[in-house]
């Protein structure tokens, strides 16, 4: 299975994003626009104790989250990583396959594994998992992941994880030395290195917040949404974010403020700490104690959200499960006061936080603690075609045009008519055909005529060629579609396909002003049979009742039946020669349909001619006869009939006889004696 780690540092795209130029054996060719990354042969070197991520961090994404994965790969690309941060996807329901993603403007394939064990064995360099499992299954999946010593960090995105389960996960993780971020978190980000899931928002926001390169400020918050605001504030007032983590809003997060701030304290590249707490819980006091004891010495800019809670007469539950003060100690106002007294940089309001942060940053720049790095070139953002089209940035000609139906909105439309109106107005099958076939509502009598044609052509017994083909195919054990198609493929000029020809010939003669006898004589001189005239069984004395039904309906309902009258006059001429040269059902339907197109008021003359030339009449026969062919399939299946073999006594065998050797050059010739 393809993997997604770099084979070399080759710059395959001009952006410093290394990838292999040649495909692995057995894969597609090198010009298929697929970016390939070979699997590593050994695990990466362990990170320092204070670091969770670096520019080589690799992870699994647990759960099928293509948008989040694509966001992570886009972040990797603009950070100029040599390989994607996502090594593979673990999806326990779908089997093992590959998922196609973009690496810049090229495509790459990410393996999808059904089992954690297989994924772990295949990728020894992975030590992070972004777990998108639901609140119902996140406990079991996280416990399974923690059984593998290779995994060092797990981000749990799901909200609503039972508190007992969350505490158990945190307990086991602490024993095993695993860092848990979450539950109920958007994740975290280390600019220029790695981002968890949807952290940082869309790519334009990530670029605006300068998260594609490292800064000097490390922050920790509960809220994922507010972490995005911190990214924005820090990018505008300092040299940018060094690392940011949202620990999650539940009451029992896997790691707390102090865990991450101690990491930042130990990291020499992180110069300023930012703590964004909130009402509820006492985790901020652990940080206060660490500052008082001199464990944390770096400057901390801090604020606890929720000071407005004191304005309410009763305690208020804010958005997070943990945002509820059970005592005065847990209120935001008390926390802010305590942090200020401990030496934190605490603004008077959250709105004052950017100015205070800039003040602290400028001070560290002035004393040389922070040396701002030159600003790199802003990377180009690969943008999805669908997003660019939605923004109106691009246009392209459509590959297909459809004028009959639209499923893009809330309700399906048939030629502009909502499907609910189709049923509310009870337009029936004929009405639906008028919308989809002709893109307009036809009069009720016309829709009824269409339904009548379908009913009349639905079946004509098992002896006709179409039904026989379907029956034989069914008895050979084939499926419904194969058996139906076998019958439909017999429809043509000799079986069921006379409708278009009859409409063409009768219309041409009528429009030329030929009398019925002149029309018959002309066809005879051309050695042509008249389509729609003649029947193998029915005759003038044994009429086809289907034809009688059509004639009766058309005479009663149609505003004009000139072509039908002309065809009946032709029938008078032909039956005078032979009794079975009657106007058959194909011919009758054809001429009546022409009368409908020309006289119902819904079509212009040109439109009527166009629909006839398109083959719409044969379409009526195909649609109607499909009903009967499916019926024959079901009938044979119901009867459990076996494979059909034609009897010998119904076949005349006429075999060729080989002559004695003749003159040179005649070898191999055979003569059939009949």
From Swiss-Prot:
CC terms in the record's Gene Ontology section: cytosol
Main location: cytoplasm
Location of the active site: 320 (tele-phosphohistidine intermediate)
Superkingdom of origin: Eukaryota
Binding site for ATP: 261-281, 312-338
Family, as annotated: Belongs to the succinate/malate CoA ligase alpha subunit family.
Subunit comment: Composed of two subunits.
Identification of the protein by name: ATP-citrate synthase subunit 1
